[in-house]
């Protein structure tokens, strides 16, 4: 039985039972058990039907009441509880020094906020309630259509595999998902283009430590801006981007991940694990991400307007990534997915990541509000989301230089339909 994991952190108690930041060196089984007790109370609240029906103000009141009770029991530090209404998170610190939080906006509501349909002034692109991996479709530009035809007839003697990609899908558990069918479609299409694509729908912290196996890694998950308090004698606050996973915290995992939890490389929101930039910096400190392209769809991956935070990109580049792409601000779902689709399609055609991204922006707009208004949207969100490239804009997949449109002969439309059907 594991009883402790050594790690740098904070530990001490004052006369009132509050824990202050000094030098906790281990996460014990007792610490993990206390966190699980607190997590059980938090998830009982956030997973309840009553919480789902509450207004945001009512959720805040309920969250603060729950944390007050947990502080009374000595499970969380009372002086660490902090409300960030702008980002919709109540943050806190467990008694052992690990960071936690309660989301005031549920994951499915995050989908609604960024879906650009209904109250946002646009209709869904199709009846998503009826959408399945076989009926979801993504639009094809003419050059991608011709590339798919060329590969079908092997007129360019392309290699069987032009690279390996992984979609780290953590938006939801895929059940009745409005998003997942489109990603399943993209996976199948890219496979047909020679990009061997793995779809990971149960993304874990361990998975995010093995991204170096792929040429292209796509982080398809919710993101947030997390603010927390720290310091013993003088309190400070820090805000940083995080990536939310669907991996639930357990006692065993808390012990295994003890180093990262105590070092604040991993935090817990609503009892689920989330990662900070330092998680990637530590996981790939030896530069294992050599030549990998990282494409993040997460909201606020690079912070927000007037507070751009490049820590995620810097950590991945320091870990050896050749190129990192991510968004500033919250991004509309359909715009983000369309940008991903067009960019990867053109990567698979042999373009550099810089050219592929430029094509996507020319097609869908420099930012999501431009796209939104062109679609007839009437009530755009406050700040436009835009995709930024860091690192080498000339990174590319293993596609021959001579893979050009001029070398492709025209193919029958009905044969292309067969390609797309097999991909779907």
How would you label these PLM feature ranges?
Residues 31, 37-49, 62-66, 130-254, ...:
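A domain-level signal for caspase-like cysteine endopeptidase catalytic cores
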Residues 165-169, 216-220, 292-297, 323-327:
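Structural recognition of the beta-strand scaffold that forms the well-ordered cores
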Residues 19-78, 82:
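Short Lys/Arg-enriched alpha/beta "domain-start" segment
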Residues 293-423:
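Active-site-proximal C-terminal subdomain of hydrolase catalytic domains
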Residues 79-164, 303:
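Structured catalytic cores of large enzymes
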Residues 5-16:
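Sec-dependent signal peptide cleavage junction
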Residues 27-28, 46-57, 168-177, 297-304, ...:
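Second-shell loop/turn segments in exported
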Residues 226-322:
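Cysteine protease catalytic core and zymogen-processing segment of caspase-like enzymes
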């Amino acid at each position: 039985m594991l009883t402790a994991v050594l790690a740098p952190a904070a530990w001490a108690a004052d006369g009132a039972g509050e824990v202050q930041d000094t030098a906790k060196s281990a996460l014990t089984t007792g610490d993990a058990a206390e966190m699980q007790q607190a997590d059980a109370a938090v998830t009982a609240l956030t997973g309840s039907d009553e919480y789902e029906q509450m207004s945001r103000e009512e959720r805040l009141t309920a969250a603060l009441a729950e944390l007050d009770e947990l502080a009374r029991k000595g499970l969380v530090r009372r002086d660490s509880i902090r409300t960030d209404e702008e980002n919709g998170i109540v943050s806190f610190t467990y008694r052992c020094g690990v960071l936690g939080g309660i989301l005031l906006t549920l994951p499915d509501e995050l989908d609604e906020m960024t879906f650009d349909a209904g109250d946002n002034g646009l209709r869904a692109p199709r009846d998503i309630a009826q959408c399945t991996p076989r009926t979801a479709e993504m639009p094809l530009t003419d050059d991608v259509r011709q590339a798919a035809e060329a590969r079908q007839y092997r007129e360019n003697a392309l290699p069987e595999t032009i690279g390996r990609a992984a979609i780290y899908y953590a938006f939801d558990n895929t059940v009745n998902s409005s998003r997942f069918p489109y990603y399943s479609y993209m996976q199948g299409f890219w496979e047909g283009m020679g990009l061997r694509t793995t779809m990971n729908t149960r993304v874990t912290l361990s998975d995010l430590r093995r991204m170096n196996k792929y040429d292209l890694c796509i982080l398809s998950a919710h993101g947030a801006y997390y603010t927390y308090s720290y310091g013993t004698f003088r309190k400070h606050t820090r805000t940083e981007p995080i990536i939310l996973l669907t991996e639930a915290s357990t006692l065993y995992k808390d012990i295994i991940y003890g180093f990262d939890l105590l070092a604040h490389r991993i935090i817990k929101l609503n009892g689920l694990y989330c990662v900070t930039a330092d998680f990637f910096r530590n996981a790939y400190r030896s530069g294992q991400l050599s030549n990998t392209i990282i494409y993040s769809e997460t909201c606020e991956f690079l912070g927000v307007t007037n507070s751009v935070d490049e820590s995620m990109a810097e950590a991945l580049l320091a870990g050896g990534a050749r190129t990192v792409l991510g968004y500033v601000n919250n991004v509309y779902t359909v715009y983000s997915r369309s940008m991903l689709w067009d960019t990867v399609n053109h990567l698979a055609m042999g373009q550099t990541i810089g050219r592929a991204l430029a094509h996507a922006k020319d097609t869908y707009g420099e930012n999501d509000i431009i796209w939104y208004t062109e679609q007839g949207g009437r009530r755009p969100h406050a700040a436009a989301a835009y995709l930024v490239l860091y690192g080498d804009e000339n990174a590319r997949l293993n596609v021959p230089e001579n893979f050009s449109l001029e070398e492709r002969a025209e193919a029958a439309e009905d044969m292309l339909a067969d390609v797309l059907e097999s991909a779907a």
